[in-house]
From Swiss-Prot:
It comes from the Bacteria. GO terms for biological process: thiamine diphosphate biosynthetic process. Keywords: Cytoplasm, Schiff base, Thiamine biosynthesis, Transferase. The gene is thiG. It comes from Salmonella typhi. InterPro entries: Aldolase_TIM, Thiazole_synthase_ThiG, ThiG. This is Thiazole synthase.
Amino acid sequence: MLRIADKTFDSHLFTGTGKFASSQLMVEAIRASGSQLVTLAMKRVDLRQHNDAILAPLIEAGVTLLPNTSGAKTAEEAIFAAQLALEALGTHWLKLEIHPDARWLLPDPIETLKAAEALVKQGFVVLPYCGADPVLCKRLEEVGCAAVMPLGAPIGSNQGLETKAMLEIIIQQATVPVVVDAGIGVPSHAAQALEMGADAVLVNTAIAVADDPVMMATAFRLAVEAGLLARQAVPGNRSTYASATSPLTGFLEALA
């Protein structure tokens, strides 16, 4: 069970809604993933119409919606987008994204911290997408963010946990949930994140662009479950030397 702010989730896999070939395929993949928290970009939906092609199927699916501010380049733009989302969807939950460079889509740490502090004061449940910077993540936690969402690699790159060393520090020092977001390309990346101690992962591109998104969503669900079980089982310590699983000489002594 994963608790963030006032909500609890059985699934430790969060999903996105971009890049799917159709809304029907999107919903089928989300259902196969078991995800209960789904993020969607405010810039991609018609907030005035709940029968929007993306929004309506998600509402019908009964998942918790996590609007995001993707496309915002400044704290002011992100705050404005958050207020629009609150008015349209009636949720204080928000994935805060501010990335001014469209080529790399890396989060702006200064604007993110500035916006997070303001939004928390306005009553939002803020989940900020941020760089894998332990100092920044601690600052975001201190201003009241409900979780932190450090990147594993650039958005949509499928590179995996390129920031592993920094993620380990973030996980070790965090007192709020850590959700690894961005760059996760295959299910083994997700399993590794959970094994490391991450509370959840958010996956979009890797599922949406697969030849079979529904099958890939299922694979991610199983990988996240496996990673969590492995962590709970407490793996053995890593060793420099070999350690035999059975006596090396006992059978020889028995023959003597």
